[in-house]
Design a protein with these regions (language model features):
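Charged/polar, solvent-exposed surface patches and flexible loops
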Residues: 13-17, 55, 215, 219, ...
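A short, hydrophobic/aromatic-rich structural module that often spans a beta strand
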Residues: 8-14, 19, 111, 186-198, ...
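Intrinsic-disorder-associated interaction segments
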Residues: 4-5, 87, 293
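AAA+ P-loop ATPase mechanoenzymes
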Residues: 1-52, 73, 306
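C-terminal engagement/docking regions of AAA+ P-loop ATPases
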Residues: 32-38, 47-51, 63-70, 237-249, ...
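Walker A/P-loop NTP-binding motif of AAA+ ATPase domains
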Residues: 34-237, 242, 254
Length: 319
């Protein structure tokens, strides 16, 4: 879709007026943040997922001529699993690993409309912009809200929105648009969306294991005033069943405690975060994901990533 500069400028102005402003702002701001501060080095654990995405997605986009010679295109992916396990953050870090690729992060509110068929129109406009800016990594957060299961009512406007998504997802990679999505509820997604050619890979991202939890504590504490004798392995053992968001909360809770102590202290600029304080923070915070929820996710994992499937519809990440 290369045109002369003046026509291209007019086209962009037109699209920016019709596509939700929030979506456009999010796309620009997240992309800049990713390039400056994010990358796989910011992720704790997820080694198998990093390798899978690097080999099947990032290397393909970063080496287009070689990929074209072998007829290879990046697959569309759905990351699913318990909340707070880093699916959205992974997508943002993933974008930072790719050269010259536009990153657009879309949330349900970005396409919401009070007008009948308004959301349907915005879906088409969004993909038009993504194609124009290609190559584009289009990331949908809370994907189940975009493509819920359809019912038998032909006049249901939400059915029409899902149908529009199906049309847009069909071989989107042929147009330079590469779709990655995340959800905590894959069972709510219309099954037609999950067919190969629309969503090629279903990847389960589970709870962080002990090594990942230790890495999370190291990353979260690395830039804070902390004692030198913190036993990270012990903290990891104490947080069995905690997700990434829980560990982040534990560190922030301890930070707030020390902040309030520091502003009272005149003799030293900062009070150090100690292991004892972190242990108290752990006792203060219960795991966000219950054992009942984990059993349900294990059932979903077996449903969506069965043992007899090929390697691209499998379990990776924190498991």
């Amino acid at each position: 879709m290369k045109t002369d500069p003046s026509a291209e400028k007019e086209w962009l102005i037109k699209m920016n007026k019709t596509v939700p402003t929030k979506a456009a702002v999010n796309a620009d701001s997240v992309k800049k943040e990713s390039k400056k501060t994010l990358g796989f080095s910011a992720l704790a654990g997820m080694d198998e997922l990093k390798q899978l995405v690097t080999e099947g997605f990032i290397n393909v986009l970063n080496n287009p001529e070689c990929a074209k010679a072998y007829g290879i295109k990046p697959p569309s992916m759905l990351l699913y699993g318990p909340a707070g396990c880093g699916k959205t953050f992974f997508a943002e870090c993933m974008a930072a690993e790719m050269d010259g690729v536009e990153f657009m992060k879309i949330e349900p509110d970005d396409l919401a409309s009070t007008l009948i068929h308004g959301t349907q129109e915005k879906i088409g406009q969004l993909f038009d912009v993504a194609i124009h800016r290609s190559p584009t990594l289009l990331f949908f957060d809370e994907f189940d809200a975009f493509v819920p299961k359809r019912n038998n009512d032909e006049n249901n406007y939400q059915n029409n929105e899902v149908n529009e998504f199906l049309c847009m997802l069909n071989n989107a990679s042929d147009k330079g648009v590469y779709v990655v999505a995340a959800t905590n509820h894959p069972e709510r997604i219309d099954r037609a969306v999950l067919r190969t050619g629309r969503i090629d890979e279903l990847i389960y991202v589970g709870m962080p294991d002990i090594k990942a939890r230790e890495s999370l504590f190291r990353i979260e504490l690395s830039k804070l005033p902390m004692a030198e004798d913190i036993d990270y392995a012990n903290l990891a053992r104490m947080t069995e069943g905690y997700n990434c968001s829980d560990i982040s909360y534990i560190v922030k809770y301890a930070s707030r405690k020390m902040f309030n102590e520091s502003i009272k202290c005149k003799d030293a600029p900062y009070c150090l975060i100690t292991e004892k304080l972190l242990e108290e923070s752990i006792a203060h915070k219960s795991p966000s994901v219950s054992s009942r929820d984990l059993k349900e996710f294990e059932r979903l994992r077996m449903e969506f990533s069965p043992r007899n499937t090929d390697c691209v519809r499998t379990t990776v990440g924190f498991v």
